[in-house]
C-alpha cells in the first residue's frame, strides 16, 4: 500500500515538473511573442535525470523499506526537482553541477537504505562521528576556501569540488545528542549532570562556527541543541535560555562581525539603503511582489536580478515565477515534511530514534524558516540554504541523509511505539514549526498582494526597465493627435522616443538609469497598460506573457503649433509660459525654459543634475516666483483698488487661490512665503494663470487640465477626470469691470505687466486674456521671465494670445 501511495505522489510531482520544464522551453517564444526564437532545451536533461534518479530510489525504498512513510520521499523529490529546474533555468552551469550532486545524493541514499533501522551504529560511534565532524569543520580555519573567491571560508576544496563540513555536522550533532540523552535519561540523573558533557562538545561546535563568521549555522546549532534538550527533559527553561543565547549571539555579531552588522541593518531599515547594503533584501521583496498571486511563469520572470538567486534567495526566485500560489504549495510541502517527521518521532520504537527523528525534523524546519524568513524580511539574512532546493552539494547531500534517517526510523515494521509519558514538548515543537510556516505564508501574501503595487512602482525596480523593452508603451499626443512622445523598435528592443524634446520639463522621461518624471511618471499606469485595460486583459497578459498588456495612448490638451511658437520665443531665456482655456481649464501651452533633450539623457543626465539653470524643473508648475505687482488686476477685481494694505493683500491671495496648490496630472509646487509679510508670497505661473482665467470667465477660476483622454481598447477615447475643482473667485461683474480697466486703447483683450524682485534676479510677469464679450473660447496667457524685460514678456504673450484668438 505504501508503495502505491508513494508512486502516485511521485507521478503528481513528475507531472508538475514536466509542465514547468515545458513552459521554460517555450518561455523565449512567449516573451518575444513569436515562434522564431531559440528555445531552451537543456533543462530537459535535468528533468530526465530527476526521473531516472527518483524512479530508482522509489524502487529501492519499496524493496528495502516497505513500511517506511510514503509521503516523505515524494515531498523531498518534488522539492529537489523544483530546485534543480530553478537553478538550471537561472544558470545551466550551476544546474549541471546540482544535477551531479543530486545523482551523488541519490547514490548515497540508495546505499543507506540497507542500513539497520535500529541505527545502533550512530549510538555506538557517537563520539567518533561528532569528533570527526568537528575536526573537518576545524580544518576550514586553516585550509578553508570559498568557491566564489571571497567571503567566509567555510568549504574544503580540491580539484574543483567543494564540501562544507558544517552541513553534515548538524546531523552529527543531533545524532550525538539523541544517542547520549537516550542512554543517560533512564539513569535518572540530575539535569545539570545529565547535560554538562553535551554543553562542552556542542559549545566547541558553536565556537568553531563563530570563528568562521558563520553565525547563521551557529544559530541553527544553538536552536537544535536547546530543542533536543527540551524534548528530552521537558523543561521550558531551555527554550528561554535558547532565545537568550540567540539574542546574545546576534548582539555580539552585530557589533563585532561586519557582515552580521550589515545584515541586521538591512533587515531593520532596508529602505534607507536599497541600492547598497539592503540591495539583496529589497530585490528579494521586489521579486516576490512581481510574482503576485499566480506568478510570471517559469522562465518569464527576472529572478536573476536578485543576488545569489540560486542559493540564498531561491525562494524569491520561485516566488517571482510561480507566485503566491506556488510558494504556498512549496511551504505546504515543507509543512508535510515537518508533520510526517514529527509523526515518525512520536511513533518511534525507542527514545533514541524518537529524539533523532524530532531533531532531524527540527533541523529541516528551522533551516527552512530561516531562509524563507530572510527572503521575506521576517528574519535577518543568515546565508543558510533551503533544504532540497538551494544550490549546494553539501546541503543537498545532508538533506537526503536526513531524509534517509527519517525513512529508516519510520520503517519499524511490527515494533510498537516507545512509551511517551510527556508528549507535550513534541506537540509544542510541531505547533511552533507549523505556525512559523503559516506566518511565512502570510508574509508572502503581504508582500505579493498587499504591498505588491507599491513595490513594483518603485523607480529602483529594474523589472520595469526589462518590461519596457518587451511591451510597447503608450504615446503622449497633443490635442490634434500629433505624437509628442512615442515608442519605436520591436519586441525586445523597444526604445522611448521624444518627438518634441522641448517639452521635456512637462512630459518628463522614462529612463532605465534616471527613472521617471513628469507626465511619464504620473500617467505611467495608463502608458504601461495597467490602467484603462479590462481587468481580464491585464490578468491574461500577466498569466500568458508574465508582463503588462500594451500601453494606452493619452491625449493632452496641448496644441503643438502654439507650443512650438512659445518655445521659439523663449529660446535663450529662463522662465515659463502658460496659455489656458479660461473656461475649461485646458492648458494649450506649457513652456518651461531652459529645457533639455531627453533622447540623450544617458549622456547628459549627470550634468543636468548639477546645472545651475535647473532645466529639469518644470517652471510653469514647480517654479515659485514673487508676486510683486502682478496681483494688481486681481486686487482691482476684488477691492476696486490696487494700493493694498497687508491684510487686503492676503484677502486677494485667498480669494484667487494663491494660498492653495493646484491639482494637476504633474507634480505642482505649493506656494511659499520667504517672510511673514504678505508681499513676499511666491507662487507658480500656473496659479497666476488660473487666477487670470477668472477675469476672462465671469469670475470663475477653473480647475486645470493637461491630460484630457485615454484611448481604451474597449470603448475608444475616454475622458479623464479633472483632478481639481473650479471655484468662484469674485462676482462676474467685478471680474468684467477689472478686465475692462486693464484694457488699453480699446483692444480685444485685457493685459498687465507686473514686476517683482527675486532672490537672485528681477522677475517680469505678463498677463493677458480675452474679455467677457469675446464670442469664442475664452483664453488667458501668462508669461514669467527671470529678468527685467517687460517688452519681451509682452511680445511673447501678445503673439501667443492673438495667434490663438485668430488661428
Where do the model's predicted regions map?
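Membrane-helix boundary/helix-loop-helix interface segments in multi-pass membrane proteins
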Residues: 2-213, 372-387, 391, 395-396, ...
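Hydrophobic alpha-helical transmembrane segments
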Residues: 46-54, 103-104, 320-339, 629, ...
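Membrane-interfacial entry segments at the cytosolic side of transmembrane helices
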Residues: 121-127, 191-196, 233-244, 418-431
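Periplasmic/cell-envelope proteins involved in peptidoglycan metabolism and beta-lactam response
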Residues: 124, 410-615, 619-624, 634, ...
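Hydrophobic, glycine- and aromatic-enriched re-entrant/interface helices and adjoining loop segments
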Residues: 138, 147-162, 230, 238-330, ...
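Hydrophobic alpha-helical segments of polytopic membrane proteins
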Residues: 192-210, 215-255
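Loop-to-helix entry and N-terminal half of a specific, functionally important transmembrane alpha helix
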Residues: 344-383, 389
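Beta-lactam-recognizing serine transpeptidase/beta-lactamase-like catalytic domain environment
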Residues: 541, 583-789
Amino acid at each position: 500500500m505504501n508503495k502505491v501511495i508513494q508512486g502516485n505522489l511521485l507521478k503528481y510531482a513528475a507531472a508538475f515538473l514536466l509542465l514547468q520544464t515545458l513552459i521554460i522551453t517555450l518561455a523565449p517564444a512567449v516573451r518575444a511573442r513569436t515562434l522564431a526564437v531559440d528555445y531552451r532545451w537543456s533543462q530537459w536533461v535535468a528533468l530526465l535525470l530527476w526521473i531516472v534518479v527518483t524512479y530508482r530510489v522509489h524502487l529501492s525504498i519499496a524493496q528495502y523499506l516497505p513500511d517506511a512513510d510514503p509521503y516523505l520521499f515524494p515531498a523531498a523529490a518534488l522539492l529537489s526537482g523544483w530546485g534543480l529546474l530553478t537553478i538550471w533555468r537561472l544558470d545551466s552551469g550551476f544546474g549541471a553541477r546540482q544535477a551531479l550532486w543530486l545523482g551523488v545524493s541519490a547514490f548515497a541514499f540508495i546505499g543507506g537504505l540497507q542500513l539497520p533501522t535500529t541505527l545502533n551504529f550512530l549510538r555506538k560511534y557517537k563520539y567518533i562521528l561528532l569528533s570527526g565532524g568537528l575536526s573537518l569543520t576545524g580544518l576550514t580555519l586553516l585550509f578553508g576556501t570559498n568557491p566564489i573567491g571571497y567571503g567566509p571560508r567555510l568549504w574544503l576544496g580540491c580539484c574543483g569540488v567543494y564540501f562544507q563540513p558544517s552541513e553534515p555536522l548538524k546531523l552529527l550533532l543531533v545524532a550525538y545528542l539523541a544517542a547520549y540523552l537516550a542512554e543517560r535519561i533512564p539513569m535518572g540523573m540530575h539535569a545539570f549532570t545529565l547535560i554538562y558533557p553535551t554543553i562542552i562538545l556542542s559549545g566547541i561546535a558553536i565556537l568553531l562556527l563563530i570563528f568562521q563568521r558563520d553565525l547563521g549555522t551557529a544559530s541553527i546549532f544553538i536552536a537544535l541543541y536547546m530543542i533536543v534538550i527540551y524534548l528530552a527533559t521537558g523543561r521550558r527553561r531551555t527554550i528561554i535560555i535558547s532565545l537568550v543565547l540567540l539574542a546574545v549571539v546576534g548582539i555580539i555579531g552585530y557589533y563585532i562581525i561586519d557582515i552580521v552588522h550589515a545584515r541586521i541593518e538591512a533587515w531593520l531599515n532596508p529602505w534607507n539603503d536599497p541600492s547598497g547594503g539592503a540591495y539583496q533584501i529589497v530585490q528579494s521583496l521586489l521579486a516576490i511582489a512581481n510574482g503576485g498571486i499566480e506568478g510570471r511563469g517559469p522562465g518569464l520572470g527576472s529572478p536573476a536580478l536578485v543576488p545569489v538567486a540560486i542559493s540564498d534567495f531561491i525562494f524569491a526566485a520561485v516566488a517571482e515565477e510561480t507566485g503566491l500560489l506556488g510558494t504556498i504549495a512549496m511551504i505546504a510541502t515543507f509543512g508535510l515534511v515537518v508533520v510526517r517527521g514529527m509523526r515518525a518521532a512520536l511513533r518511534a520504537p525507542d527514545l533514541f530514534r524518537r529524539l533523532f527523528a524530532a531533531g532531524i525534523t527540527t533541523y529541516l524546519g528551522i533551516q527552512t524558516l530561516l531562509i524563507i524568513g530572510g527572503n521575506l524580511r521576517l528574519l535577518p539574512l543568515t546565508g543558510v540554504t533551503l533544504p532540497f532546493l538551494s544550490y549546494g552539494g553539501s546541503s543537498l547531500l545532508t538533506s537526503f541523509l536526513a531524509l534517509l534517517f527519517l525513512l529508516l526510523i519510520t520503517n519499524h515494521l511490527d515494533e510498537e511505539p516507545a512509551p511517551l509519558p510527556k508528549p507535550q514538548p513534541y506537540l509544542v515543537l510541531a505547533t511552533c514549526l507549523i505556525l512559523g510556516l503559516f506566518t511565512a505564508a502570510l508574509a508572502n501574501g503581504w508582500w505579493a498582494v498587499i504591498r505588491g503595487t507599491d513595490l513594483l512602482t518603485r523607480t529602483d525596480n529594474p523589472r520595469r526597465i526589462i518590461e519596457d523593452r518587451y511591451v510597447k508603451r503608450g504615446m503622449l499626443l497633443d490635442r490634434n493627435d500629433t505624437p509628442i512622445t512615442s515608442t519605436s523598435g520591436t519586441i525586445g528592443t523597444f526604445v522611448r522616443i521624444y518627438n518634441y524634446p522641448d517639452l521635456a520639463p512637462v512630459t518628463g522621461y522614462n529612463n532605465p538609469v534616471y527613472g521617471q518624471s513628469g507626465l511619464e511618471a504620473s500617467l505611467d499606469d495608463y502608458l504601461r497598460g495597467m490602467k484603462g485595460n479590462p481587468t481580464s486583459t491585464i490578468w491574461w497578459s500577466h498569466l500568458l506573457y508574465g508582463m503588462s498588456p500594451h500601453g494606452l495612448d493619452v491625449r493632452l490638451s496641448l496644441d503643438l503649433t502654439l507650443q512650438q511658437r512659445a518655445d521659439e520665443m523663449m529660446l535663450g531665456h529662463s522662465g515659463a509660459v502658460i496659455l489656458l482655456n479660461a473656461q475649461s481649464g485646458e492648458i494649450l501651452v506649457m513652456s518651461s525654459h531652459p529645457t533639455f533633450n531627453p533622447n540623450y539623457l544617458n549622456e547628459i543626465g549627470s550634468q543636468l543634475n548639477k546645472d545651475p539653470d535647473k532645466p529639469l524643473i518644470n517652471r510653469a508648475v514647480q517654479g515659485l516666483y514673487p508676486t510683486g505687482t502682478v496681483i494688481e488686476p486681481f486686487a482691482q477685481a476684488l477691492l476696486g483698488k490696487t494700493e493694498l494694505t497687508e491684510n487686503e493683500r492676503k484677502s486677494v491671495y485667498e480669494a484667487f487661490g494663491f494660498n492653495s496648490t493646484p491639482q494637476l496630472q504633474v507634480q505642482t509646487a505649493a506656494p511659499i512665503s520667504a517672510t511673514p509679510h504678505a508681499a513676499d508670497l511666491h507662487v507658480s505661473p500656473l496659479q497666476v494663470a488660473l487666477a487670470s482665467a477668472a477675469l476672462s470667465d465671469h469670475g470663475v477660476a477653473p480647475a486645470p487640465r493637461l491630460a484630457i483622454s485615454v484611448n481604451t481598447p474597449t470603448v475608444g477615447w475616454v475622458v479623464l477626470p479633472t483632478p481639481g475643482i473650479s471655484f468662484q473667485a469674485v462676482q462676474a461683474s467685478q471680474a468684467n469691470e477689472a478686465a475692462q480697466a486693464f484694457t488699453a486703447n480699446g483692444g480685444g483683450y485685457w493685459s498687465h505687466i507686473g514686476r517683482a524682485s527675486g532672490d537672485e534676479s528681477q522677475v517680469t510677469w505678463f498677463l493677458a486674456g480675452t474679455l467677457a464679450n469675446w464670442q469664442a473660447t475664452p483664453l488667458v496667457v501668462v508669461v514669467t521671465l527671470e529678468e527685467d524685460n517687460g517688452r519681451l514678456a509682452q511680445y511673447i504673450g501678445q503673439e501667443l494670445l492673438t495667434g490663438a484668438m485668430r488661428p
